[in-house]
């Protein structure tokens, strides 16, 4: 069952032409357990997984014991709801539902991925964080972000002389809408991807967004 799911997943990735999304799955420590209908199953605690993810269909009687080294629990967040999930003592971030009314002000603040800067992402700082990453025109490496591998800043459609990625209002609205849709998919609609578990995954997601936005902006020029 798990093998079939992985085959489907990589076919989905290939169809969507977002190869980088595999980084959100490979290298993530989680346990996925498929439970068939009308069964009674006991899941023993995991010792090396960061959390346990279980798909539970209807008409199923299941007992799930707590994980011994869980960093956090993932909670389903309904639509049109802004909910903060407080991080546990061993977690370095909080997952926050992103509302539909994300606004951007002129008092733009550069986002730092230093883990000591903040232990949580709010919707607006998360939104600004990706924009700041994509708008980076310097020669920084991932070492500057507490990481080890070098990377090339993605600056295809962004201006270095302004805090806004693009000055045109129409394009700016398209970009904001795309951010909301993509982030909602990763954070709310699809709990199979443990996003923002670390900052390397965060930067990879930013690169995915940049690719999507480049296509959208080119089509609307």
Swiss-Prot record:
First and last residue of the signal peptide:
none
The entry sums up its family as follows: Belongs to the asfivirus I196L family.
- What is the induction note for this entry? Expressed in the late phase of the viral replicative cycle.
Lineage of source species: Viruses, Varidnaviria, Bamfordvirae, Nucleocytoviricota, Pokkesviricetes
Q: What is this protein called?
A: Late protein I196L
What residues form the membrane-spanning segments? none
Tell me the superkingdom of the source: Viruses
Q: What ranges cover the sequence repeats?
A: 28-48, 49-69, 70-90, 91-112
Q: What keywords does the record list, in alphabetical order?
A: Late protein, Repeat
């Amino acid at each position: 069952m798990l093998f079939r799911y992985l085959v489907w997943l990589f076919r989905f990735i290939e169809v969507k032409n977002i190869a980088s999304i595999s980084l959100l799955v490979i290298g993530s420590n989680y346990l996925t357990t498929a439970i068939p209908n009308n069964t009674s199953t006991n899941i023993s605690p995991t010792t090396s997984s960061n959390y346990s993810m279980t798909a539970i269909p209807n008409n199923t009687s299941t007992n799930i014991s707590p994980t011994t080294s869980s960093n956090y629990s993932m909670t389903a967040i309904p639509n049109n709801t802004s909910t903060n999930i407080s991080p546990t003592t061993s977690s370095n971030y909080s997952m926050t539902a992103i509302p539909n009314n994300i606004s951007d002000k002129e008092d733009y603040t550069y986002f730092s991925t230093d883990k000591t800067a903040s232990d949580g992402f709010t919707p607006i700082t998360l939104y600004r964080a990706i924009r700041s990453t994509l708008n980076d025109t310097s020669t920084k490496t991932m070492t500057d972000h507490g990481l080890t591998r070098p990377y090339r800043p993605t600056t295809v459609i962004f201006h270095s002389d302004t805090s806004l990625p693009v000055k045109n209002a129409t394009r700016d609205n398209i970009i904001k809408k795309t951010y909301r849709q993509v982030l909602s998919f990763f954070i709310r609609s699809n709990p199979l991807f443990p996003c923002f578990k670390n900052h390397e995954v965060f930067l990879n997601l930013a690169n995915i967004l940049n690719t999507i936005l480049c296509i959208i902006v080119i089509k609307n020029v």
